[in-house]
Amino acid sequence: VYNFIDDNPGVLMMDVGYTNDPYVISQNDRFVAINSALQVDLTGQVCADSLGTKFWSGVGGQIDFVYGASLSKGGKAIIAMPSITNKGVSKICPTLLDGAGVVTTRNHIHWFVTEFGAVDLYGKTLQERARLLISIAHPSAQEELDRAAFERWGSHHHYIKGYMK
């Protein structure tokens, strides 16, 4: 690989300070950033590096690319993940686990995708975000998430399985 890259005019190597600069990323119109998550809460906060206090990876450039896509003319920031773990635990949760870090804030996410659909969270209220995320959660988790959303925000909103319909 190094021999291929060395003095190859077709390859441009740049420092991470440039490649991950949200301003540089945003100069690409319709830039789409697709990232993953370990867990997301009902407000759309994304944890991509730990489960609680147990670290799985470094933060990497997720927020840089999500922010760059958000600034890009016509850009989209997408988080895509399976709705449950291989042990059957929902990755969409009422709240992040204690000690979990928010890698990407709820305000930067446009689209969230699981195998059950895609929802646009951008500009939505917290209650709307909860309703939308519940709609793409694994069916086995929807009732618990619905209950948690109702307990958190009360009866003013309509959720999927409906404690208030």
Features from the language model and the residues they span:
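Conserved phosphate- and dinucleotide-binding cores of soluble alpha/beta proteins
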Residues: 1-165
